[in-house]
Amino acid sequence: MPVRILVVDDDRAVRESLRRSLSFNGYSVELAQDGVEALDLIANNRPDAVVLDVMMPRLDGLEVCRQLRSTGDDLPILVLTARDSVSERVAGLDAGADDYLPKPFALEELLARMRALLRRTSPDEGPDSPALTFLDLTLDPVTREVTRGSRQISLTRTEFALLEMLIANPRRVLTRSRILEEVWGFDFPTSGNALEVYIGYLRRKTEASGEPRLIHTVRGVGYVLRETPP
C-alpha cells in the first residue's frame, strides 16, 4: 500500500504541483486548503505524513502543529513557509514540526526531506535492541522510553533520533555534518540552525531537574555526550 501524504496549502498551484510530484514518486496524496480542513481529514483518515504550509486562512499551519502535538499525536509534519528567518524556523520547530522547508524550494529537496522524515518514522531496530545507557541517562530503542535517573523524559521523534545517535557514541565528538546527515537524512545547508535548536531542546529536557549537563558543544566541530565539557 502506498504511503499516504496530506498536502495542506491555500495556494492551489502549490497543492497541485506537490500532488503531481508526490504521486509521480509513488505516494498517495490528499489535499486540504487550510488548517481546519486538514484537522478534519487527519481525524477521519489519518495520513502517514503531512506537508503543511504556515500562512493559511482560518487556521494556520503552526496552530495545526500545536493542536496535534497537544493531543500526543506524533504524525510526521514537514512545514513549508515563505519566511526563512531564524525566528520563523524556531517557531515552526517549537510548534512541533519535524522539519522545515522555506519557499521557494526544489521538489527534489522536498522529496529527499520526506524520505528522511518517513525513515525516522519507521525505525529499523530489531526486537532485541538493547537499551543504551550513559551515566544516569537511559534510552530504549524498542519502547522509545527515555529516563534520567527515575525521571521519565518525553521526546519528539527527531529529539529521540538525535539523542540516540549521541548516546550510541558516548565521549565521541560527532561532527555537525555527520549528525545532520544521519538524523535528518541528507546534508542541510550550513546556514540552517535546526540542529542547534534541537540540541537546545534536549539540554532543557535532560537537565529539567537540575541535573549536570551531558550534551556539550565542541566549538567549530559538533557535539559530544560526556561527563564534563571538552
Curated annotation (Swiss-Prot):
Modified-residue entries (4-aspartylphosphate), positions: 48
GO biological process, one term: regulation of DNA-templated transcription
Main location: cytoplasm
Signal peptide feature range: none
SMART domains: REC, Trans_reg_C
GO molecular function ontology, one term from the record: transcription cis-regulatory region binding
Locations listed in the record: Cytoplasm
Residue ranges flagged as DNA-binding region: 129-227
Keywords per UniProt: Cytoplasm, DNA-binding, Phosphoprotein, Stress response, Transcription, Transcription regulation, Two-component regulatory system, Virulence
Function as written in the Swiss-Prot or TrEMBL entry: Member of the two-component regulatory system MprB/MprA which contributes to maintaining a balance among several systems involved in stress resistance and is required for establishment and maintenance of persistent infection in the host. Functions as a transcriptional regulator that recognizes a 19-bp nucleotide motif comprizing two loosely conserved 8-bp direct DNA-binding motif repeats separated by a 3-bp spacer region.
Protein name: Response regulator MprA
Highest classification ranks of the organism: Bacteria, Bacillati, Actinomycetota, Actinomycetes, Mycobacteriales
